[in-house]
Amino acid sequence: MKHGIRVLGIDDGPFIKNSDKRTVITGVILKSNLYIEGISIKYIDVDGSDAEDVIISMIKGRFKNEISAVMTDGITFGGFNIVDIKNINEATGVPVISITRREPNIQRIISAVSRYFPEKVDRALKALSNGPVRLDNIYINSAGISLTEAGILIRRFTFMGRLPEPVRLAHIISTAIIRGESHGRA
């Protein structure tokens, strides 16, 4: 793997349930030497269906030729704004890795989607179809990259804690945009 590899880390900001209509989604492009190449800040609908298109637009933005891989904090943004990492990979040609700290309870997720967003059940089932794989102390899904290569990339970009630095920085920035300062665990 090259030393100058760049990863786009993506996470959303907090929102007030049943009140906020939109929330921020931040992308941080980080080189493996910890140099921040760029930041992309956009907004998505809470419980909407635009997060996938917004993420694709981030990847196809100004730094499109420099992004080697994308890492996301899960597959839901702004509540139940569900993304399918396979679709993102197919639309951009860039490998995508979804990361969560805890093993997703797929049955519980589908039950919640069925109850509150029945029109999104098929999308959720498709997005969750290849299930999470445990890697060290996190769970990942990947598209366009082997699990072995995904593991190498994640370990290369993880310096402290469990989340890779690009995702951790995206979380910190998104939270600061909404709350005025970073807060909580990244």
From Swiss-Prot:
HAMAP family: UPF0215. It comes from Picrophilus torridus (strain ATCC 700027 / DSM 9790 / JCM 10055 / NBRC 100828 / KAW 2/3). Pfam families: DUF99. Belongs to the UPF0215 family. This is UPF0215 protein PTO0905. The lineage of its organism: Archaea, Methanobacteriati, Thermoplasmatota, Thermoplasmata, Thermoplasmatales. Transmembrane segments: none annotated. InterPro entries: Endo_dU (IPR002802).
